[in-house]
C-alpha cells in the first residue's frame, strides 16, 4: 500500500461501496423490509491493499415477491460497487432462503378460541414478523405460528430480558397453556371441526 497502491485493487473498498449502496436503498423500501450485513473479511494488515474482502447479509421482507425485488436491487448495487473499484464480484447463498409465513386462518381462529377456553383473554390476531423456515412449511401445508406472552412487560426477541423471562413461573404457565391450546386445536382438526 505504501510503495505502489495504484497497482492494487482494494476489495475492501468494493465492500464498503456495497454497504453504502444498500444503506442508500433503505430509504426506498417498504417498512416490512430488513437488511442486515457484516464484513467477515476485510484484509490482513493496514499496510497491504486488501485483495479479498467478504460480507454476509440477511434480507427480509413481508412477501417473497418483495424480497425478490430487493435481492435484484442488491445484486445491481454489488455489480456497481465492483465496477466502481475494479474488483471481481462473487455472490453465493450461505443459507437457504425462508419464504414468508402464510397463516392458515381457520387454524388460527380455532387456536385463539382454545386459548380463550383456557382463560387467555388478551388475544391478538396473526402477527407475521421476522423470518423462519416455518414460512417454507406454510406454503406446503396449513400452518400457524402462535406467540404467547411470557412477561407482563414488552420483550424484544433474542435479548437477555427475553432469556430471563423464559425461566419464570409465568413463562412455564404460558408454555403449558400454549401446549394445551395446540393439542385442543389438533383435536379440532381430527374431529373435523376445522376446514383445512
Model-flagged regions — what are they?
Residues 1-109, 113-115, 126-135:
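Midchain, well-structured core segments that form catalytic/ion-binding scaffolds
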Residues 17-24, 183-191:
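Short glycine/serine- and small hydrophobic-enriched flexible loop segments
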Residues 30, 193-194:
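Residue-level recognition of short, well-ordered coil/turn positions
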Residues 85, 190-193:
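Long, hydrophobic, amphipathic alpha-helical segments used as structural scaffolds
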Residues 118-122:
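Acyltransferase
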Residues 123-181, 185-189, 196:
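Zn-dependent metallopeptidase/amidohydrolase metal-coordination segment
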